């Protein structure tokens, strides 16, 4: 999960060329749907709801014992992560605009905070939530493996969000510096009119 969310999806979104996506996402039947799905609140809810539902033990157990559903599980996590990244990494900003810098930072922080309840439950639940812990790698008990998974989830998400915040801040700083070096065309400096001497009478 965390490789898909923290590494694969961001790299995939960053590498998508606009020329490839434009004819697909601007198709008359696709664009209205994508405009709705990529709205920050809707994308945020879809991603977090999907991620949380798949961690409910009975649902997770069903997906583990079926190769077809197991594949659907990972595809859905990857797809909804890409959807959630549109407000901050839109490959077509002229069609699906990115959030302003301040809102982008708030969105990234909200994405991080939204994972805390699930990570907390997995970290502090006194019994193993999932029965599927075979083989036991490095001799870890089921409960210790669960706690380790929660720690990996929290740390990887924290590092990913901090990286996103740092990149956003650097881009904003560069844009601000470029704007400060551009001439102000709206309020040009007043140019003094040339002084013309009165004609000398002849």
Model-derived segments and spans:
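Alpha-helical membrane segments of multi-pass proteins
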Residues: 2-202
């Amino acid at each position: 999960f965390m490789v898909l969310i923290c590494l694969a999806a961001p790299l995939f979104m960053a590498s998508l060329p606009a020329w490839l996506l434009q004819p697909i996402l601007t198709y008359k039947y696709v664009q209205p749907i994508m405009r709705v799905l990529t709205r920050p609140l809707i994308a945020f809810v879809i991603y977090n709801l999907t991620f949380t539902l798949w961690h409910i033990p009975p649902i997770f157990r069903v997906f583990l014992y079926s190769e077809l559903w197991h594949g659907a599980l990972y595809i859905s996590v990857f797809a909804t992560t890409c959807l959630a990244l549109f407000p901050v990494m839109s490959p077509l900003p002229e069609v699906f605009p990115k959030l302003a810098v301040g809102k982008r930072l708030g969105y990234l922080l909200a994405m991080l905070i939204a994972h805390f309840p699930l990570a907390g439950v997995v970290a502090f639940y006194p019994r193993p939530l999932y029965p599927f812990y075979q083989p036991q790698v490095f001799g870890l008990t089921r409960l210790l493996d669960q706690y380790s998974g929660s720690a990996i989830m929290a740390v990887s998400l924290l590092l990913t969000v901090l990286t996103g915040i740092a990149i956003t801040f650097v881009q904003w700083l560069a844009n601000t510096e470029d704007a400060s070096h551009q001439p102000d065309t709206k309020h040009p400096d007043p140019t003094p009119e040339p002084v013309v001497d009165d004609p000398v009478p002849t």
